[in-house]
Amino acid sequence: MDVMNAFDSQAEDSPLTIGHSLRRRPLARKKLSEMVEEELEQMIRRHEFGEGEQLPSERELMAFFNVGRPSVREALAALKRKGLVQINNGERARVSRPSADTIISELSGMAKDFLTHPGGIAHFEQLRLFFESSLVRYAAEHATDEQIALLTKALEINSQSLDDNALFIRSDVEFHRVLAEIPGNPIFMAIHVALLDWLIAARPSVPDRELHEHNNVSYQQHIVIVDAIRQRDPDKADRALQTHLNSVSATWHAFGKKSQKTR
């Protein structure tokens, strides 16, 4: 087949191909704000505006893109959610660098919604178990003496908070946060903070007196985890962590069932 015939053949086939494609995927019209957002994002990524530099004013952006103020504001709000700009009242938007926290916060709404689905909490608890299992194994193998000292300090604060549930929850979160800090990966930190926030927010309300025993059990389990890390035994640390998180999960599931019965 010569070049001309090959081209003609493709031309004959292309309407059918396009037709099938269009039936599968309807065309979607973009909003003006989305087009402004995409163009500004590309300008930022091309470094036409550097980090810390202010973008043009809303009025200037309206004139540049030939759109109204609502489209400009929607575009800037979308860029803020992506972590590409910071917006303070009375000031022009300023270019910023996306952080790990920004990435995770974008998922927060979807995560909280997923937690309300049947089995949602169990799925997130499993995610936490897999994640922290790797953290304690890493800590047992690589934690410095200074990092182990921070874990020990967090454990001491844990022990001092046993009779105050609000304080204990904060000290519990802090203990696990120190574990998440050990690898030195900011994405790990952001994921860990978000996971705990999402799971704690999904927990039922429980009378203080019923939490005291749970607090003491958690503290004793924290001790076993830290001892295994001090001994540089990743398998033991992993087992201790899994025992701890499975215990926490079972306790809160029991609290949840009891809470439902008393309604």
UniProtKB/Swiss-Prot annotation:
GO BP terms: negative regulation of DNA-templated transcription
Pfam families (UniProt xref): FCD (PF07729), GntR (PF00392)
Record keyword Repressor present: yes
PROSITE patterns documented for this protein: HTH_GNTR
InterPro entries, per the entry: GntR_C, TF_FadR/GntR_C, Tscrpt_reg_HTH_GntR, Tscrpt_reg_NanR, WH-like_DNA-bd_sf, WH_DNA-bd_sf
DNA-binding feature ranges: 58-77
UniProt keyword annotations, A-Z: DNA-binding, Repressor, Transcription, Transcription regulation
GO molecular function term, any single one: DNA-binding transcription factor activity
UniProt KW Protein biosynthesis keyword: no
Domain of life: Bacteria
Segments forming domain HTH gntR-type: 30-98
HAMAP family (alphabetical): HTH_NanR (MF_01236)
Family, as annotated: Belongs to the NanR family.
Function: Transcriptional repressor that controls expression of the genes required for the catabolism of sialic acids.
NCBIfam families from the UniProt entry: PRK03837.1 (NF003011)
Protein name listed in UniProt: HTH-type transcriptional repressor NanR
Organism: Salmonella arizonae (strain ATCC BAA-731 / CDC346-86 / RSK2980)
Taxonomic lineage of the native organism: Bacteria, Pseudomonadati, Pseudomonadota, Gammaproteobacteria, Enterobacterales
